[in-house]
Amino acid sequence: EREELVESDNDVHAGEFETSLVLAVREDMVDERTIPEKEFDFPDPKMEFDHEPEFNYTWNTHDLTKTGVIGDATKASKEKGEKLWEAGIERLKKRLETVIDISYPFE
């Protein structure tokens, strides 16, 4: 799963996770020579991004970084992206199986 594959803390936008996903399916769209070094960490641990859907807050990434990247894309890889896609597809499959198994009208 994501937690096991993604090494970076606060990997929010265009970092290790998203870049790995793109490398796996459209490697031609990633110019690895232009990937910036990690430049941003949240100043307060309470602000850290935890990928939990219960509570989200937003910001303009360009207010936080010069590049708009929040994460460390230098740790991205095609192989990691392939594993992330496989894990995501498996999660989606399980969710769909749950929906299919729900009988209607509800008992």
Task: Locate the predicted segments by residue.
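Extended, histidine- and acidic-residue-enriched regions that form the cofactor-binding/catalytic faces
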Residues: 1-107
